Amino acid sequence: TGQTTCYNSTGGTIACAGTGQDGQYQAGIDPVVAPTCCGTTNAYNTPAWTGVRFTDNGDGTVTDNLTALIWLKNANCYGPPNWATALSNANTLANGSCGLSDGSTAGQWRLPNVNELHSLIDLTQSNPALPAGHPFTGVRSSFYWTSTPVADSTSYAWFVFLYNGVVGDDDETMTYYVWPVRGGQ
């Protein structure tokens, strides 16, 4: 998650040792990316995040240097459709739409899974809960669909609330925003 600080229940900074928070483990660093972006290692032998989190590729995409995922720069290209339409919109995204000039074709983009979308969240921020200085445009402090269906339901899927980073689930007929991604899985 890129978190290196730990917090108590009132939001105050605390020592990370023994908390079990992300700041203690500093997990989520891709070892392939680590040599070019990261500095020292922690007690768990994972690199501590010290690099530039996002790269604006200048073609309508943004690379997350922490996860190596490529995101659509425009986080509000489609407005808020239902879940089935959100899946379709992401899958049919291609060069020439939504500000893209990257040469991508339909089928290369997809709706992110719940872990991928939540990896963008910075819990020290709100409205939206994204890292300060992020390069994205059109971000709504609202609900965004993920591709992850709820395991014990045939009509519910997971979302991330960009206002504060909360993850929840809702009926697939609800209309939430779409933020396509490519790479990873």
Predicted regions and their residues:
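Glycine-aromatic-enriched surface loops/turns that form tight recognition elements
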Residues: T1-R110, V114-Q185
